[in-house]
């Protein structure tokens, strides 16, 4: 097989020598290996990445990658992954031919973690072609029939054809393996485009397959993250786009809807909300796209094993603790790799097989394998306060205890209310109550009476930064507690509600959530208000590893003091 060469031809002896060395390196590189199926043609898997700003990598920074342990090193070139790109609107940033996969300038895109996540799972090589520009519409710029504005559809075809043409010219056998698509935010602002997003996406996919002569090209459609400010102030519009995406995935057997509502989101100034994913969100959505592709191949991520030995004796009553919430309860900024042993010599990473642990994270994106030993179990190497909470409680209490964790970091409090909102697919209360009922039923089926020891809920972070939601935060929490108690037939179910410092901004400060919650707790003998205003490692809305450990310990200590 011939190697791939760069578009710009070198001149002079030194340049020719460099090219000669590169050619020989590439001939020994993954370009020359077979694919996972043992294809005799040694086809390279080529993926196309396309979309707008949250595909481009807006508001990301390659220097921030080191903050997030699972992704450290992705600021460096991935020498075994060829990369072709054209980014931007008026002023295009082009690779000028095939280059090595790495951040483009300071931008971090999902392709970095996508490739890194796939390489250990696949034999053979892969390559990425990327064409993206912020502020573009599927109804206009990406419209294959009547492209307008920045005419992204013909640009995409031009870039893909030229990139593939260079591979063909050099004798590289390739296989178009999928389109990774993240777009839709801008179509929200044009009523016609918003209403017809699903039809436009179906037409776009059909036409692209036709133009590329790839009739079965898989398309991985990235969900718009509801953790952004637009997930609140533009909730109905975001919902409309999501319905269009789901419609396209439902009618097209080669299209797949990729859930992204739980991935990280950049924190903006001054109140911590943003509409771009930033560095962490880009890297996490890259993993989700890779996992979607692996599921397409019949593979996919595997979780922790179920308990090998049931920790309770038949007939024993199990005290069940329920942890719930949004971004910090899920553990968005808390990483296992940053965990250090406690001053009391506790090893937070050590599984506790005496505590059965069940969880549903990211609104159901990640779930336990039945009951597991209590241990860090979040996506992307994250964990929540359940780890330190469980260690402290297990040491302090006698008798069997179990834990259930139910979180959705892409939700707001309204999603947890029994009424929900106009965004019907985001209604989380039915999931919440079903998780508790199923956990109780599981334990009872194993012969254990269940004592619901309490719900430990961390008040929604995003709600504190958006006036209309902050205004109704406590009343919505009250509805959640009331309906949960009613549905579980547990009118005296204890709630422990932790509250971090609410967003400090002049207009928002007129809404005194702390006072409202204090008043609610005074009127409810089964509600404990826990003010955690001194946690370490808090930056605006999010709490880091040390702070999440401290939060779990504080929750446990509050419960123990209340007994």
Model-found features: residue ranges?
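N-terminal secretory signal peptides that target proteins for export/translocation
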Residues: 1-11
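Composition-driven detection of intrinsically disordered, low-complexity segments
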Residues: 12-14, 32-33
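Bacterial N-terminal signal peptides
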Residues: 15-27
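Cell-envelope and extracellular/periplasmic
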Residues: 31-563
């Amino acid at each position: 097989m011939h190697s791939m060469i760069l578009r710009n031809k070198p001149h002079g002896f030194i340049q020719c020598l460099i090219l000669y060395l590169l050619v020989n390196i590439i001939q020994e590189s993954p370009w020359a290996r077979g694919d996972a199926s043992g294809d005799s043609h040694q086809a390279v898997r080529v993926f196309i990445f396309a979309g707008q700003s949250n595909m481009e990598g807006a508001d990301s920074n390659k220097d921030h990658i080191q903050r997030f342990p699972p992704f450290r090193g992705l600021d460096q070139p991935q020498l075994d992954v060829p990369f072709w790109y054209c980014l931007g609107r008026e002023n295009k940033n082009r690779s000028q031919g095939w280059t090595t996969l790495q951040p483009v300038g300071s931008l971090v895109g999902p392709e970095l973690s996508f490739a890194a996540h796939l390489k250990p799972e696949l034999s053979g090589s892969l390559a990425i072609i990327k064409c993206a520009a912020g502020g573009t519409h599927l109804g206009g710029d990406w419209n294959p029939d009547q492209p307008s504005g920045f005419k992204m559809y013909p640009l995409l075809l031009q870039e893909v054809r030229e990139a593939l043409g260079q591979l063909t010219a050099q004798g590289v056998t390739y296989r178009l393996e999928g389109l990774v698509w993240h777009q839709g935010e801008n179509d929200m602002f044009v009523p016609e485009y918003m209403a017809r997003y699903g039809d436009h996406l179906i037409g776009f996919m059909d036409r692209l397959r036709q133009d590329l002569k790839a009739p079965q090209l898989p398309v991985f459609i990235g969900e718009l993250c509801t953790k952004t400010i637009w997930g609140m102030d533009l909730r109905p519009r975001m919902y409309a786009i999501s319905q269009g995406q789901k419609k396209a995935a439902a009618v097209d057997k080669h299209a797949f809807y990729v859930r992204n509502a739980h991935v990280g989101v950049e924190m903006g100034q001054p109140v911590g909300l943003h509409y771009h994913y930033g560095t962490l969100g880009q890297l996490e959505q890259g993993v989700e796209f890779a996992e979607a592709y692996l599921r397409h191949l019949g593979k996919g991520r595997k979780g922790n094993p179920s308990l090998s030995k049931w920790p309770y004796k038949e007939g024993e009553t199990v005290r069940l603790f329920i942890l719930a919430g949004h971004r910090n309860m899920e553990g968005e900024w808390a990483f296992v790799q940053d965990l250090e042993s406690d001053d009391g010599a506790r090893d937070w990473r050590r599984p506790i097989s005496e505590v059965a642990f069940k969880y549903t994270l990211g609104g159901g994106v990640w779930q336990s394998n039945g009951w597991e030993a209590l241990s860090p179990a979040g996506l992307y190497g994250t964990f929540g306060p359940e780890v330190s909470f469980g260690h402290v409680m297990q040491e302090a209490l006698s008798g069997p205890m179990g834990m259930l964790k139910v979180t959705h970091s892409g939700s707001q409090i309204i999603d947890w209310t029994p009424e929900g909102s106009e965004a019907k697919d985001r209604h989380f209360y039915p999931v919440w109550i079903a998780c508790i009922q199923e956990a109780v039923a599981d334990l009872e089926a194993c012969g254990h009476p269940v004592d619901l020891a309490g719900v430990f809920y961390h008040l929604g972070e995003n709600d504190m930064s958006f006036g209309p939601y902050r205004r109704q935060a406590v009343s919505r929490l009250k509805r959640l507690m009331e309906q949960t108690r009613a549905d579980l037939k547990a009118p005296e179910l204890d709630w422990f509600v932790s509250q971090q410092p609410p967003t400090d901004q002049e207009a928002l400060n007129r809404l005194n959530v702390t006072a409202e919650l204090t008043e609610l707790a005074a009127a409810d003998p089964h509600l404990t208000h826990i003010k955690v205003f001194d946690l370490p490692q808090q930056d605006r809305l999010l709490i880091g590893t040390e702070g999440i450990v401290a939060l779990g310990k504080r929750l446990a200590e509050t419960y123990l003091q209340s007994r």
